[in-house]
Amino acid sequence: MTFLEELKARGLVHQCSNLEELSKKLNEKSITLYCGFDPTSDSLHVGNLIPMVSLLRFKKAGHNPIALIGGATGLIGDPSGKNQEREMLLEDLVLTNSKGIGQQLEQITQSKIVNNITWTKEMSVIDFMR
């Protein structure tokens, strides 16, 4: 069974543009992938379990997973598929939450941990749009 077949058998593949091409890439060489984590709380929760286990599976299969903390996107807020926008969090709270989640992710995922606030905080709107 290939790595992708294992993921599919476990119900971890919902949609893919080209399963054949993805399978080929996964079997040919190591890939780098990321999974995002929202800093809406100071701790991970049960909803983060499957993404974290998936990162571990990719690591075990020889790939390079990255856990991405959404420090910048957490400051913006989003509708989260709801009828109303998520409550805007203060910058200090997002920073605290990001640190807490980052420490937990380091212990659990064996992945590189990055925070998108690192490369977006000083970026101008023009630079972002370009």
Question: Where is each model-derived feature located?
Answer:
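NTP-dependent nucleotidyl-transfer catalytic core
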Residues: 1-130
